[in-house]
Amino acid sequence: MRKSQVYSLVGALVLALASLAIVPPRANAQGPGLVSSIINRMERNRRDLRSLRAGIQMEKYNAQVGDKDMYFGDVIYLPTAGREASVRVDWQKPQRETLSVSNGKYTLFRPRLNMAYVGATNSSRSKVSGVLGFGLNVSQAQLRANFEPLQLLGEGVLYGNVHVTWLKLVPKGKASYKYAEIWVDDNGMPVQTKVVERNDDSTTVRLVNVQRNAPVASDEFQLKLPGDVKKVNG
């Protein structure tokens, strides 16, 4: 497997748009007032969020060939100081893999190959926590400083039972992606995030069965690899 493929997966972490019913914003809900209230709810969620466990679904879309890959698994998340966060994803389908990001480093373990890719979460690889961090670990001040005024795209119901508001985030200045979209529930939790790259490829991540502030120990992010695992530095 080429390193670029590894970095692509490490940089992925985002999921599917299936079963999303969105309607335009109600006339009496339009304008900066509603967007401001959503940002305030997101800020409260960020402040109060000490940990997270959830199911995770990811869709990676290749715009050049019109193809997409789907991934399913479980995620744990532990915010830390600044924008860094500890993230672990245990993929179950289509193949079993574990990705852990903590203390500025990542490990991607592929049991079927008996191989682990390790490296620093800089450059494109920092997206691992960054995609989730669009809403989970970014402050109100950072949202206002780093993005154009947030655009309200609509409201709707995700998977039949989660009411969400749909926002578009366009970065100020130069960025590695064109824009991001987030779907925020009524408690200010971003339950779905989509990042569209400059070549129109996209990665969408969705959290399901979210458990806010569930017990998560810091040592859960330290992978205990078998002694015979081959490590490849990224």
Where do the model's predicted regions map?
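Bacterial N-terminal signal peptides
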Residues: 10-19
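Positively charged n-region of N-terminal signal peptides that target proteins for export
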Residues: 1-4
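N-terminal mature ectodomain segment of secretory-pathway/periplasmic proteins
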Residues: 37-40, 44-108
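Boundary at the C-terminal end of the N-terminal hydrophobic targeting segment
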Residues: 21, 27-29
